[in-house]
Amino acid sequence: MLKREMNIADYDAELWQAMEQEKVRQEEHIELIASENYTSPRVMQAQGSQLTNKYAEGYPGKRYYGGCEYVDIVEQLAIDRAKELFGADYANVQPHSGSQANFTVYTALLEPGDTVLGMNLAHGGHLTHGSPVNFSGKLYNIVPYGIDATGHIDYADLEKQAKEHKPKMIIGGFSAYSGVVDWAKMREIADSIGAYLFVDMAHVAGLVAAGVYPNPVPHAHVVTTTTHKTLAGPRGGLILAKGGSEELYKKLNSAVFPGGQGGPLMHVIAGKAVALKEAMEPEFKTYQQQVAKNAKAMVEVFLERGYKVVSGGTDNHLFLVDLVDKNLTGKEADAALGRANITVNKNSVPNDPKSPFVTSGIRVGTPAITRRGFKEAEAKELAGWMCDVLDSINDEAVIERIKGKVLDICARYPVYA
């Protein structure tokens, strides 16, 4: 018999200490990694539920195990909410991650060796969009497209590459691009050569759900996303589509299970269902609008302080600061800001002279600080502190002074009150 009062603290002090230290770190550090966010206690309640015990290979109503009548309800709720939120007529909530959702699309629609057009990682793409170290770059013939001198997607070059290489699939989406993608233009290019348009909206799904960023679902053959990041749910993946054939949807389902995964994580799917319901609330739209406002406010300060921002601004939740002219590396900036309790990630910038392990830039995102309650005034103040650190990157007194300010504002704006 398992006693409900069993706990980690009494049983595994070493593990519990690390967990508690991470809790403190999250409360005492300002989180600016664009792919990170704080999920609600309701989502964590779902993830810590007894649903974790249940195997449920298959799909609602078509399981390979018995005893699935209640997890069927859970998964169907998540499916229905995903379809409603994004205006889709197909949803698969089983992918364990965004990368596995992307793997599903590749295996459902392509054969190894097929040609794919994907955004260059150095220009803002993602590992799964064709990086040579990833399955996508190893199994498929990847042709990269990128951004122009203004920092925006070069659609003319994309169209030229498409007509020249005749890819079977074009990938839209990004991990470090601060502009608005013209999904209709991408579909037009895909249709002109008979290619699939696959959109990975992992970074902007929350903005899309709130109507703050254009929805790719009506334009793409298939859309994937993570359920964390701007969507603020549990770590996981999601596949969506609209107007496709039953044959396409069967291919996608089969590529998830049994093609790429076994049993779904029902406790995580419950967390997805909660997050999707939360994303339908009016306050979620207000939150996403503030995410975008805060990003613009921070960019304004960086530009005023003489820092170069890729594309000159942002139209979503993130932006890239190019440090080449400052003779700083992303690695140095990341470390110095970290000592001030400000967490960012080093990031390559277009035409970066440094390696991906060093880089010449940092990526800044506002979902997490906005979740704490920051508005434009706090975002601008924070950007100023970051510039202070970067201007005096070797001055530990400056870094310590900013750390004190960070601790103070974190205490005033706790993650979990």
From Swiss-Prot:
Pfam families: SHMT. Gene3D superfamilies: Aspartate Aminotransferase, domain 1, Type I PLP-dependent aspartate aminotransferase-like (Major domain). One of its GO terms (molecular function) is pyridoxal phosphate binding. The modification N6-(pyridoxal phosphate)lysine is found at K229. GO terms for biological process: glycine biosynthetic process from serine; tetrahydrofolate interconversion. InterPro entries: PyrdxlP-dep_Trfase, PyrdxlP-dep_Trfase_major, PyrdxlP-dep_Trfase_small, Ser_HO-MeTrfase, Ser_HO-MeTrfase-like, Ser_HO-MeTrfase_PLP_BS, SHMT-like_dom. It is found in: Cytoplasm. Its EC number is 2.1.2.1. HAMAP family: SHMT (MF_00051). NCBIfam families: PRK00011.1 (NF000586). Belongs to the SHMT family. Homodimer. This is Serine hydroxymethyltransferase. It comes from Shigella dysenteriae serotype 1 (strain Sd197). The gene is glyA.
